Amino acid sequence: MVYTATPLEKKVTVNTLRKMKADKEKFITVALYDAPMAAMAQKCGVEVVLIGDSLGMTVLGYDSTVPVTMEQMIYHIEAVARGNSRSLIIGDLPFMTYATVEQTMINATRVMQAGAHMVKMEGGAWLVDSVRMLSERGIPVCAHLGLTPQSVNKFGGFRVQGRSEEQGEQIIADALALEEAGADLLVLECIPAELGARVTQALSIPTIGIGAGIGTDAQVLVINDILGLTEFPPKFSKNFLLEAKDIPGALQKYAADVKSGVFPGPEQQF
């Protein structure tokens, strides 16, 4: 069946995404940062919008996400929330704003009050206490495993994670621990496609992949990559504007290719 992107008719919730996973229906995620793009995403049927700390590199000109501040995140979350009333909106907690449980509570509250419906944090089992605390207090959580860009200095660069059997098993163990603690979604970034599929099958919560293969429940790309604005695009990305006449067309093409299983192709996987 050919998928045709249509505007979202109802507000997307965590339950919407759980049902889509159960029905084996892929959902669309786009990382973007302003009201006009947020409104366009809603019109193009994008179920999930992520305001990522990737804005440090895509919007602010930093060479990593490490310098991004809470104030910068709040500014862009508020802008996106004003432009989109139906997609599920996820807001990132930036570098070192969730190092302790108390700090996590304070900053997650700010993200939610800015208009997000869920907060995202990078890290493995060390986050379990913070995830459980937020979940028990009614704040939905999106976890993030694999290549976690805030740890780029520890990794020695933006490198694929989970290639060894030991690394892969650790990612699976962390994913299960985060789910048990109450995480509602999980982003998997830059891991082998086979591992992305294994993690997805092991969890009851939906997974969102970026460079994690075609076996995840959803895909996410940064709007800059979708529109070909990145000077040195990552392997997992694709310029969809080349196959469309305008920006809405590029978003619709991205959505259609994800829904139909065309994207990511072999050339976008590890």
Swiss-Prot record:
Metal-binding keyword on record: yes
Annotated InterPro entries: Pantoate_hydroxy_MeTrfase, Pyrv/PenolPyrv_kinase-like_dom, Pyrv_kinase-like_dom_sf
Alphabetized UniProt keyword annotations: Cytoplasm, Magnesium, Metal-binding, Pantothenate biosynthesis, Transferase
One protein family per Pfam: Pantoate_transf
Location(s), subcellular: Cytoplasm
Protein's pathway: Cofactor biosynthesis; (R)-pantothenate biosynthesis; (R)-pantoate from 3-methyl-2-oxobutanoate: step 1/2
Coiled coil: none
The family this protein is said to belong to: Belongs to the PanB family.
NCBIfam families linked: panB, PRK00311.1
Protein name listed in UniProt: 3-methyl-2-oxobutanoate hydroxymethyltransferase
Organism: Saccharophagus degradans (strain 2-40 / ATCC 43961 / DSM 17024)
